[in-house]
């Protein structure tokens, strides 16, 4: 437990293995829990408009704690912060298992996720260095994508068998993540002894927001990534209602399979962007962003499984090609102005605010009785128009 970052910077050190395993199990639990809890809402006859509210309480925790979680990660050993955060997730999942209101339990999971995010990326630079750090980030992303794919499908498949079994599996995944965190070496805090004056912390965070917003390139990146992830999470919930209407399938597993196609496509698109787009040619990604909206519109009109799977894979490819260069631009420019950690925290705030707004509009549309197919058509058209407007604005500035 006393292994030092200075004594072992191997990519496959005990500490690095523990981080990757913990990340996989934690992300697996996050994705499985979403679909397991959605199945619970269906089983308990909650109204359809309440489904996106579940994700809204989750991202609300991110927004509420955005000014503070970065300092928490830097003020304590990051492995212990990760363990505490996964403990909160475990408590939230277990509370849903034992009949506590699912929205309350899921909010607790959101608080844990908000605390976990800055620590999981920050610890990589403390466990390894140099070129190995890039590879470590690659391992982290690979484990996350694998967890999204397997967790989403597992949540839906297990929920079709028994909802309680699916929820229990999520709790076990979080429990495994807590155990894995124990094996992360207890490293020194990066910035101990900082002031915990909440007003000053909030002011400092708002200053970082202002600095990034005043820079044309980082503002462009923030708006683009926020639109993308807001649309992405809304599409997840759109699929849950779209599948029974368009395909006539009422199980919990099919929407998870469709979501998995998007995740696979993102990996392919991200790889293509890495080869074809540089920081100097970021605007090359913009046509892909516009096409996302067009393909969502076409997808909404489908009634057969094969075209639906293919179009969602294409949406993922376009999404990966669109968002990866924007992320790289923000990290590079943000690192020089407000620091990488602050840039990520501001980006998290923007993306989660967009998710909250888009999910709120989607929930309202469902509540007033707009059919899911017209919602999908309008959603795709508006997204394409928004990215077109962003591209025109970027070219003028």
Swiss-Prot record:
Residue intervals annotated with topology Cytoplasmic: 39-52, 112-144, 188-226, 278-280, 326-343, 388-397
Transmembrane intervals: 18-38, 53-73, 91-111, 145-165, 167-187, 227-247, 257-277, 281-301, 305-325, 344-364, 367-387
Gene3D superfamilies per record: MFS general substrate transporter like domains
UniProt keywords, alphabetically: Cell inner membrane, Cell membrane, Lipid transport, Membrane, Transmembrane, Transmembrane helix, Transport
Source organism superkingdom: Bacteria
Cysteine-cysteine disulfides: none
Topological domains, Periplasmic: 1-17, 74-90, 166, 248-256, 302-304, 365-366
Subcellular location: Cell inner membrane
Chief location: membrane
Gene Ontology cellular component annotations, sorted alphabetically: plasma membrane
Function, as annotated: Catalyzes the facilitated diffusion of 2-acyl-glycero-3-phosphoethanolamine (2-acyl-GPE) into the cell.
Matching HAMAP family: MFS_LplT (MF_01585)
Similarity comment: Belongs to the major facilitator superfamily. LplT (TC 2.A.1.42) family.
Protein's name in the database: Lysophospholipid transporter LplT
Origin organism lineage: Bacteria, Pseudomonadati, Pseudomonadota, Gammaproteobacteria, Enterobacterales
GN (gene name): lplT
């Amino acid at each position: 437990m006393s292994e030092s970052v200075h004594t072992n910077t191997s990519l496959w050190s005990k500490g690095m293995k523990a981080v990757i395993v913990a990340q996989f199990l934690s992300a697996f639990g996050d994705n499985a829990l979403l679909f397991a809890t959605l199945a619970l809402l269906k089983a308990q006859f909650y109204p359809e408009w309440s489904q996106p509210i579940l994700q809204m309480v989750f991202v609300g925790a991110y927004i509420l704690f955005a000014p503070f979680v970065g300092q928490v990660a830097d003020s304590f050993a990051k492995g212990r912060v990760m363990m505490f955060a996964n403990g909160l997730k475990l408590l939230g999942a277990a509370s849903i298992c034992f009949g506590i209101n699912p929205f309350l339990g899921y909010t607790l999971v959101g608080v844990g996720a908000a605390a976990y995010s800055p620590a999981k990326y920050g610890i990589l630079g403390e466990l390894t260095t140099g070129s190995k750090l890039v590879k470590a980030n690659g391992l982290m992303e690979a484990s996350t994508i694998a967890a999204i794919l397997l967790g989403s499908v597992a949540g839906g498949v297990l929920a079709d068998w028994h909802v309680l079994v699916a929820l229990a599996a999520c709790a076990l995944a979080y429990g495994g993540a807590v155990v894995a965190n124990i094996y992360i070496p207890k490293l020194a805090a990066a910035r101990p002894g900082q002031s915990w004056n909440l007003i000053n912390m909030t002011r400092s965070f708002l200053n970082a927001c202002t600095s990034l917003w005043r820079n044309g390139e980082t503002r462009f990146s923030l708006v683009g990534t926020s639109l993308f992830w807001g649309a992405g999470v809304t599409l997840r919930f759109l699929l849950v209602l779209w599948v029974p209407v368009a395909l006539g399938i009422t199980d919990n597993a099919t929407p998870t399979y469709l979501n998995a196609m998007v995740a696979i496509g993102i990996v392919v698109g991200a790889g293509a962007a890495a080869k074809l787009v540089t920081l100097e040619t970021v605007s090359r990604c913009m046509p892909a962003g516009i096409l996302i909206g067009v393909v969502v519109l076409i997808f909404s009109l489908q009634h057969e499984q094969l075209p639906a799977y293919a179009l969602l894979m294409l949406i993922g490819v376009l999404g990966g090609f669109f968002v990866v260069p924007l992320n790289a631009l923000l990290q590079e420019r943000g690192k020089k102005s407000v620091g990488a950690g602050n840039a990520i925290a501001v980006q998290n705030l923007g993306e989660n605010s967009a998710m909250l707004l888009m999910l709120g509009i989607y929930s309202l549309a469902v509540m007033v009785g707009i059919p899911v197919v017209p919602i999908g058509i309008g959603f795709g058209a508006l997204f394409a128009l928004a990215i077109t407007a962003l591209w025109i604005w970027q070219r003028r500035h």
